[in-house]
Amino acid sequence: METNTLNISWSKSIVNLIAKKNINYACISPGSRNTPLTHALIKQKSIKCISHIDERSSAFFGLGISKKTNSPTIILTTSGTATANLLPAIIEAYYSMTPLIIITADRPKRLLNTGENQTIDQTNIYSSYIRGMLDIKESNKISILKKIENIIDLSIGNHNNIPGPVHLN
């Protein structure tokens, strides 16, 4: 399957899973890497999408929504330094036990660490301040969707877990 078609298919599946978990808000900082996910979120009628050009503002806006609703908000951004801008809100969410689902649209592995700010290794960038992390690199859709569901449950605080931020990369 062509990469673009594969990205669109994955994005629709991930967003459908998010919608089934009754997550109703997404704060999106648009960019080329997250276009398939942005499109899938916008098409999902049960999710209200709010666009932010500044990633830091997006993360704090989403944190406020999550605090108000006691439900995770999706924070979607592109790759590289854009992901670093989310860290202050993630730390606050972690210590306030507020659910957030951070989705970062990473570059393919072969393009990482090539000397550009958009190519940093972002897999463990939030590791000290999240409840769970999943680096989506697998091709088995059923297996990966189950893992995504488990990560979302960690954010919500299901199964006697403390709610808080999680990261899907």
Q: Which residues fall in each region the model found?
A:
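N-terminal alpha/beta PP-like core and its mobile active-site loop of ThDP/TPP-dependent enzymes
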Residues: 2-169
